[in-house]
Amino acid sequence: MTPVVSIIMGSTSDLPVMEKAAKLLDEMEIPFEMHALSAHRTPAEVEAFAKGAKGRGIKVIIAAAGMAAHLCGVIASMTTVPVIGVPINSTLDGMDALLAIVQMPPGIPVATVGINGALNAGILAVQMLAVGDEQLQDKLAAYKEDLKKKIVKANKELAKVSFKYKMN
């Protein structure tokens, strides 16, 4: 099986966040790879990865970084493969990473999710892959239906909570 999604993180300290995307891709039966690459510490490896991704069959790249979060943009600057950026909460409550990822110059887009939003990055990657793939669209629909059922159940449980002035 050849991976179609790459999950890239600045270091393995990002794994607790990024494993949410990995678990979703596993659940959706999408082959993926994971690498630790740093725009600042391993720039040659980042360049080789980015320039070779399309040729290796990668369709979507999920890249995560904290602090001076240049990894996502550097990768996006060297490939035509869509890049989804995940800002990692570190210094400044992740705002530095968020702004570094979202404020890309014209022509070098990085789709950006919320701080530590690896699950949404995984979902977005699946949605990109599902264009023209009815089986994957069905899996996404089932996933979202399951989310709906969880909220309906939670709402029913909330109805049982009692307070003196709660009217429902």
Regions found by a protein language model. Give the residues of each.
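Short glycine/serine/threonine-rich phosphate/pyrophosphate-binding segments
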Residues: 14-18, 42-46, 65-74, 93-95, ...
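Glycine/charged-rich beta-loop-alpha catalytic/anionic-binding loops adjacent to active sites
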Residues: 3, 30-31, 80-81, 102-110
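Glycine-rich phosphate/diphosphate-binding loop of Rossmann-like nucleotide-binding domains
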Residues: 2-41
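Short, glycine-/small-residue-rich phosphate/pyrophosphate-handling segment
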Residues: 92-138
